Design a protein with these regions (language model features):
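Extended, low-hydrophobicity, polar/charged segments
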Residues: 1-177
Length: 177
């Protein structure tokens, strides 16, 4: 097992932050649960909207539905504001995908795709490169709080810096009420 694979999820996030030129000590491991946006907002005493919700989707490739062909699956990370809901129809339209080609990942698939468990999926430090879409509603806040690899670890970051370190694509993805 490589040194990278042996690192804990939080250590991987700290290493990824350092690789981006950020202080790994930004990561706060808290006694409180931060696995939901509401819990994270309470734990860091921040507005709900400043919490980054991480949603992992699976995009199915062109072989989907062809008898005998393996289903190609590519993970897609979608980051939205804690006080918003991702609009799957809008997401599909932005990606030019049919309903059959995009679905939310199950917890085991999230772990397999990113190396992190649901409730702790960060914007960086994944096993492999994951395409990342970041909703623009997060830009309302000077500082946003992202998961740091476990259900009780988070880190603060400016929205623009989040887009940069995640190699993310800023896009409008939330439901309009």
């Amino acid at each position: 097992m490589s040194h990278e694979l042996a690192a804990t999820p939080v250590e991987r996030v700290k290493r990824a932050l350092a690789d981006c030129g950020l202080d790994p000590n930004l990561v706060r491991e808290l006694p409180a649960d931060t696995s939901t946006a509401e819990a994270a907002a309470r734990a860091v005493d921040a507005p709900l909207g400043s919490i980054v919700k991480s949603l992992v989707f699976l995009v199915y490739g062109a072989t989907e539905g062809i008898p005998g062909a393996p289903a190609e699956r590519t993970p897609l990370l979608v980051l939205v504001s804690g006080d918003q809901r991702a609009d799957v129809h809008r997401l599909r339209a932005a990606l030019g995908l049919s309903k059959k080609r995009l679905r939310i990942a199950q917890p085991a698939e999230v772990l397999d795709s990113t190396g992190f468990e649901v409730g702790g999926v960060p914007p960086i430090g994944h096993w492999a490169t994951v395409r990342t879409l970041i909703d623009r509603t997060l830009s309302r806040f000077d500082v946003v709080w992202a998961a740091a690899g476990s259900p009780n670890a988070v880190f603060p970051i400016a929205y623009s810096r989040l887009v940069t370190i995640a190699n993310g694509e800023a896009i409008d993805l939330v439901e309009e009420f």
